[in-house]
């Protein structure tokens, strides 16, 4: 489980679709590995994640950040009006429903940009041999990247409540793995991703609409779990 103008009917429709899967196990264990170390395998099976510090060079992370900013600015320049969502050159950009604390540029208002992995440095990252080797240990040899997103986490943005990623992807071809890269310091002050260790062993919980005023469309929340 992780945590980070929409009418009630659209929220209800979205959560009903998610909750049709309730009870499906959110992840699978791995037994034999070729590339992962024993400690990495143990972390995956026990905690549900593997943490690899300094996996990508700082210069490459900075290049990713600047490339995303350039993409967002291009989206807005090519749009005829102020929008909540932008589509340009195959990318989808989503604005925050609740404005961040400080806005100087359009990227300060953004929540996410989707569909980045087919080009440039993003495609370079997902095709790293060491990344693919580790994913192969978990997923098997046939690997496909079906989704990519850049999350801004600007100061004052709501972030997303506790949820299970598997609830958003009702596929019959499990398992699925998220390869998450921090392109800036992942600190509590910066609003880092939070994971509940061991929650991957649980079935999917009921996901309810995020009822905070100004929450983004598609944000759902698990409320039948004690996170204290």
Predicted segments with their positions:
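Non-heme Fe(II)-dependent double-stranded beta-helix
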Residues: 2-46, 53-162, 169-171
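Short helix-to-loop capping/linker segments positioned immediately adjacent to catalytic or ligand/cofactor-binding
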Residues: 120-123, 166-169, 181-184, 226-228
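Short, conserved beta-strand element in jelly-roll/cupin
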Residues: 138, 163, 170-188
